[in-house]
């Protein structure tokens, strides 16, 4: 850039000079070849490139927005204010792009957000309000409040989600109807401050009652949950015991069945053995009877043949 231009101008001027010179330009340096008296000499001149310094742009506060007048509606005022913010932001982005166009992409300035511009405007309005505090103007204070409202600095956030806030329009319940409606004599005798004290006391009492009710519900739920866990454990133990008893009974029944089968088999064997022995004894007795009867018949035939009467003594 600048070094090349200076080198080019130097080469044009040197070509028109008295001495014959030849200039060779390379990146970052300049080589000059001089010839004097038939003798050539090379000179190397280092040309330092001028470093481009980035241009920085100061950030100034935006002009404070005009306060809305009673004749102008609030919607049109907010619309014009938003358009002014967008136009200011667009011009700021354009200027930053024009400044950073010649520089490297890493040297571009980051753009400001809309919230930051709103904070800058609020700071400017606050300074203007501090300067005009001696005059006692309310419009500057309204502008500051409006600016703070735009960025949400004056909004109070609830940090305790479990906080109990008294209702402005409570619905009277049948249980607390007698507390909410005082007697006519009390109303006539009590003043405004006493009524406020009664309402504050009632609110505190309701708060205490609500806390007690919540504690009661939580404790009852804990007891019920503990009982359910114990009931589950007891049911499991009962099931185990019943299962063990049924298993023992079935095992004993199996043993009894085996013993019964063995006893029945033994009894059947004994019966068969007794019957077999009885048959044997019966057969032997029948044989003895037949033998004796045959002997008696033989003796009777012999006596009949001989003709002799039997004696009184028997053979048996």
Swiss-Prot record:
Residues 40-53 have a biased composition (Acidic residues). One of its GO terms (molecular function) is signaling receptor inhibitor activity. Induction: Induced by abscisic acid (ABA). Residues 92-104 have a biased composition (Polar residues). InterPro entries: Remorin_C (IPR005516). Residues 143-153, 277-287 have a biased composition (Basic and acidic residues). Keywords: Abscisic acid signaling pathway, Cell membrane, Coiled coil, Membrane. It comes from the Eukaryota. Residues 1-108, 125-202, 267-287 are annotated as: Disordered. It holds the Pfam family Remorin_C. Expressed in roots, leaf blades and leaf sheaths. Expressed at low levels in stems and spikelets. GO terms for cellular component: plasma membrane. It is a peripheral membrane protein. GO terms for biological process: abscisic acid-activated signaling pathway; negative regulation of brassinosteroid mediated signaling pathway. Residues 242-288 form a coiled coil. It is found in: Cell membrane. Phosphorylated by BRI1. Phosphorylation reduces the binding affinity to BAK1. Residues 125-135 have a biased composition (Low complexity). Functions in abscisic acid (ABA) signaling downstream of BZIP23. Acts as antagonistic and negative regulator of brassinosteroid (BR) signaling. Binds to BAK1 and inhibits its interaction with the BR receptor BRI1. Inhibits the formation and subsequent activation of the BRI1-BAK1 receptor complex. Belongs to the remorin family. Plants over-expressing REM4.1 are dwarf, with dark-green, short and wide flat leaf blades, short panicles, spikelets and grains, narrow bending angle of the lamina joint, and short leaf epidermis cells. Interacts with BAK1. This is Remorin 4.1. The gene is REM4.1.
